[in-house]
Swiss-Prot record:
Quaternary data: Homodimer and heterodimers.
InterPro entries per the UniProt record, alphabetical: CASP/CASPL, CASP_dom, CASPL
Membrane-related topology note: Multi-pass membrane protein
Subcellular location: Cell membrane
Residue intervals on the Extracellular side: 51-82, 144-165
Location, primary (coarse class): membrane
Annotated GO CC locations: plasma membrane
Organism superkingdom: Eukaryota
Protein name stated in the entry: CASP-like protein 1E2
Recorded family membership: Belongs to the Casparian strip membrane proteins (CASP) family.
Transmembrane segments: 30-50, 83-103, 123-143, 166-186
Length: 195
């Protein structure tokens, strides 16, 4: 004779061979936390790079016989298409994170079609964020190191604040993309458990 013990702990109900979520499994708290994290990180990354601007006075010598001229030079995110792509991608991901958060909370009936659409869009956000991070990272690296083969000098020695702000925005966006990636992985594990 098998004795079935019934214990309840942290929203989980356990019998001898099965574990089920008492709340019905419709609302996953870790899913909501990751969506809030993705929303916050992509919002801060977009705003941080969107307000990034630095002006410096640079000495420019046109001819060796002429004295150098001091010229104000400004670095803005809008001057590089990779940074524009980065800001727009993070704004899209942030908007989607807010929408998907509302849809996830509102999906109390467990609509499978909506769940699949959210998972597919999470995957699209991973691709969008990682591609924009790669593009902005490549330009940022060019700013830090330059490229001697094409005679592009490094500019981060002059525009240090601008470059540091780009680096922080890239890091935040990377972790925002990682949050979306974890959402996709969780959805894949949930799908695997069902089958």
């Amino acid at each position: 004779m098998e004795v079935e013990s019934k214990t309840s702990f942290g929203g989980m109900e356990s019998k001898s061979k099965e574990v089920k979520v008492v709340t019905g499994g419709k609302l996953r708290p870790f899913d909501l936390v990751l969506r809030v994290v993705a929303l916050a990180l992509t919002l801060v990354a977009a705003v941080l790079l969107g307000v990034d601007k630095q002006t410096k006075v640079v000495s420019l010598q046109l001819l060796p016989t002429l004295p150098p001229m001091d010229v104000p030079v400004t670095a803005k995110w809008r001057y590089l298409s990779a940074f524009v792509y980065f800001v727009v991608s993070n704004a899209i991901a942030c908007s989607y994170a807010a929408l998907s958060l509302l849809l996830s909370v509102g999906n109390s009936k467990g609509n499978k079609g909506l769940g699949l659409a959210i998972t597919v869009m999470d995957l699209v956000m991973v691709a969008l964020l990682f591609s924009s991070n790669g593009a902005a990272g490549a330009i940022g690296l060019m700013g830090y190191e330059g490229n001697s083969r094409v005679r592009w000098g490094k500019v981060c020695n002059v525009f240090g604040k601008f470059c540091n702000q780009v680096a922080v925005a890239l890091g935040l966006s990377f972790f925002g993309g990682l949050a979306f990636f974890l959402l996709v992985v969780m959805a894949a594990f949930a799908l695997n458990k069902r089958h």
